[in-house]
């Protein structure tokens, strides 16, 4: 049983019990959230496709923790002009655990 979900503008292939890091969710740690399902399939071969209009699939996930991603450095320089700018960025993330995939 697996599903393709969308959260934070990205798509993920998931199965029950899997942990993954997604863009920060507006939910407390330990809270259950329902994630948008694009496509799902179960062991019997039954599938649900959101684009075909069969919105019968639901994926439930639990927020494990909130964290920040790896730091990236942005450096700009103009040769021979003495122009240098450095900026850093760390993305806010949430780690979720897929608890259940239901079709129908």
UniProtKB/Swiss-Prot annotation:
GO terms for MF: rRNA binding; structural constituent of ribosome
Cellular component, GO, one term: ribosome
Pfam families on file: Ribosomal_L21p (PF00829)
Membership in a protein family: Belongs to the bacterial ribosomal protein bL21 family.
Name the record gives this protein: Large ribosomal subunit protein bL21
UniProt KW RNA-binding keyword: yes
Biological process terms in GO annotation: translation
